[in-house]
Amino acid sequence: MVVIRLARGGSKKRPFYNIVAAPARIRRDGRFLERVGFYNPVAAGGEEPLRVAFDRIDHWVSHGAQLSPTVARLVKDAKAKVAPAA
C-alpha cells in the first residue's frame, strides 16, 4: 500500500518536511516514489510555508494511496485557502 506522508528534513530545531508518496513498509525518511509538496512549519518572513501538488495527490489517491492524518489536515487547509481565491 502507498501512503502520502511527511518525511522530515532540515536541521535540529528547524524542521522541514517533504510531502511524499511512499510504500507503507518503508521507514519515514527512506525511499519514496514521488515528492508531491513540502511543509515548512517554521517559515519566517516571505518564505512559503506549504506547497502541495493537488493534481499529484489526486493521482495517487485514485490509485489507492492513503493520506496520513497530518497530510490530510494540511491538504484540507491548503484547499480551503485556494478555493476562495478562485
UniProtKB/Swiss-Prot annotation:
Keywords from the named record: Ribonucleoprotein, Ribosomal protein
A Pfam family annotated for this UniProt entry: Ribosomal_S16
Coiled coil: none
An example Gene Ontology molecular-function term: structural constituent of ribosome
GO cellular component terms, semicolon-separated: cytoplasm; small ribosomal subunit
Superkingdom of origin: Bacteria
UniProt cross-references to InterPro entries, sorted A to Z: Ribosomal_bS16, Ribosomal_bS16_dom_sf
Membrane-spanning ranges: none
GO biological process, one term: translation
SUPFAM superfamilies: Ribosomal protein S16
Disulfide bonds: none
Homology family: Belongs to the bacterial ribosomal protein bS16 family.
Protein's UniProt name: Small ribosomal subunit protein bS16
Name of the coding gene: rpsP
